[in-house]
Amino acid sequence: PAIAAYPRVQFLLGHAGARDVGDALAAAQQYPNAWLEIACQGATQLAGLMGAIGPERLLFGSDWPFYPLAATLAKVLLVTEGKPDARAAILGGNAERMFAAAGATRSVS
């Protein structure tokens, strides 16, 4: 697959694979250059992703205007309750790290 052929390219898998979340998770487990954007995944699925690969390669995404922004944010806040580092990573820190790994030179801060 392309993700294996281009290890220096960062791949952001939208909606964490949507209905194919198992395939997206397998890719993230196998390839360190795979990141999962979590729009449209429920709180239970998000908790499962965090348990499987940790929060370090999960990125906040809302899929707005098709999915309510508040719902996506609420599930992140729920699943990361008491885990401030995970919350900060998912809500922005991971995006900065992913873009830095891709060669971006300007911070979003």
Describe the predicted segments one by one.
Residues V9, A34, Y67-A70, A102:
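Generic signature of intrinsically disordered, low-complexity segments enriched in small/polar residues
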Residues A18-R19, P65-Y67:
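Short, solvent-exposed loop/turn segments at secondary-structure junctions
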Residues P1-L59:
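Catalytic pocket-lining loop regions of alpha/beta-barrel enzymes
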Residues H15, L36, D63, R87, ...:
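Conserved, mostly hydrophobic/aromatic
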Residues P55, A70-S109:
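Mid-to-C-terminal alpha-helical segments outside catalytic/metal-binding sites
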Residues A43-T44, F66-P68:
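Short gly/pro/ser/thr-enriched loop/turn and capping motifs at secondary-structure boundaries
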